[in-house]
């Protein structure tokens, strides 16, 4: 009788022990799973994975070594047209201006220029390496997540290219497109369309041309220093000869040719096409096909005293290949496709926009 009681107690102890071990193991697995979940955001900043809506089995992997594309230039220089044409390509996504990226880059530049601030940061352990790593993660997060996934991601924030050299350092495989336009046309567009740009006095052609000269000189110099990583594209030539320049551009970016880039207006608002912002000033222009309407609208609008001093006010005009005294200038003859687009727009009853 006593032997049987001992046997029953032993069985009961074994059952209780087994249940306890099972519970502890399960609890440990749950804790491990939660820790993994909590660590995921930290990992995602270094290695982001998104999935397309079309094929959930195909992930897009993003990291600092991917071939990012940055489009920039002085505002009103064709940056929106360029990004819309690239956005029409099925393998590329640019999207709207983030507005955040040039501001955070300007802040980083300010820290670097101030010897006192840099010393304070170094003393706090916030070294250049720490800041570069943080900038990589922050910028990549913005670029990746503010739009749809794609094989090639691009960012279009015009003044971001003031930091072209730094961007090339933290994104070693990135490429840059610098949009160049006749400064007289860019400035007339800013003033006539009342496009507010920090530091530009829209009541003065002289002031705006001086600021244009300073900004484009900064970006153009960095573009040349970046050598085969940066391609300057003249807005006038892109508009006059879109196929030639888009083929040149896609070869530069190592992206296969696609005819869709010549007809961006047909893909506006469509899935996988061109997404436009309601608040960007160029939106009402890029909904049209490529045309020459805006090329010479500045002629006859610039004050005579500014025209007289143009070569001194804006020496970058001559450096970029524009004649500062030509009024009107001769940019060249448009391709037949562009001529046809322009004629159709001129026959349209829609009121033309100033540019």
UniProtKB/Swiss-Prot annotation:
GO terms for molecular function: protein-tyrosine sulfotransferase activity. The chain crosses the membrane at residues 9-25. The keyword Transmembrane helix applies. 3'-phosphoadenylyl sulfate binds at residues 76-80, 181, 189, 193, 235, 282-291, 297. This is Protein-tyrosine sulfotransferase 1. Residues 341-355 have a biased composition (Basic and acidic residues). One of its GO terms (biological process) is post-translational protein modification. Residues 99-103 are annotated as: Interaction with peptide substrate.
């Amino acid at each position: 009788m006593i032997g049987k009681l001992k046997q029953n107690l032993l069985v009961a102890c074994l059952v209780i022990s087994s249940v306890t071990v099972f519970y502890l193991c399960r609890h440990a697995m749950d804790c491990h799973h939660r820790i993994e979940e909590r660590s995921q955001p930290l990992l995602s900043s270094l290695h982001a994975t998104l999935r397309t809506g079309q094929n959930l089995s195909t992930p897009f992997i993003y990291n600092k070594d991917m071939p990012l594309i940055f489009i920039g230039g002085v505002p009103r220089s064709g940056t929106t047209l360029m990004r819309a044409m690239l956005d029409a390509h099925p393998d590329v996504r640019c999207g709207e201006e983030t507005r955040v990226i040039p501001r955070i880059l300007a802040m980083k530049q300010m820290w670097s220029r101030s010897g006192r601030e840099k010393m304070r940061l170094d003393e706090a352990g916030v070294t250049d390496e720490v800041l570069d790593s943080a900038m990589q993660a922050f910028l990549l997060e913005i670029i990746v997540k503010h739009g749809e996934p794609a094989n090639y991601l691009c960012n279009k924030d015009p003044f971001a290219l003031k930091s072209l050299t730094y961007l090339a350092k933290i994104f070693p495989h990135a490429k840059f497109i610098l949009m160049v336009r006749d400064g007289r046309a860019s400035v007339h567009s800013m003033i006539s369309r009342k496009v507010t740009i920090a530091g530009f006095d829209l009541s003065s052609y002289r002031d705006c041309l001086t600021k244009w000269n300073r900004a484009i000189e900064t970006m153009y110099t960095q573009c040349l220093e970046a050598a085969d990583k940066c391609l300057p594209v003249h807005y006038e030539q892109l508009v006059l000869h879109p196929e030639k320049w888009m083929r040149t551009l896609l070869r530069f970016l190592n992206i296969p040719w696609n005819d869709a880039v010549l007809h961006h207006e047909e893909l506006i608002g469509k899935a996988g096409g061109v997404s436009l912002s309601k608040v960007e000033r160029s939106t009402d222009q890029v909904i049209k096909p490529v045309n020459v309407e805006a090329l010479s609208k500045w002629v006859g609008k610039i004050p005579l005293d500014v025209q007289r001093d143009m070569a001194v006010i804006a020496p970058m005009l001559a450096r970029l290949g524009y004649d500062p005294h030509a009024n009107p200038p001769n940019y060249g003859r448009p391709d037949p496709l562009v001529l046809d687009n322009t004629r159709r727009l001129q026959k349209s009853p829609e009121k033309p926009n100033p540019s």
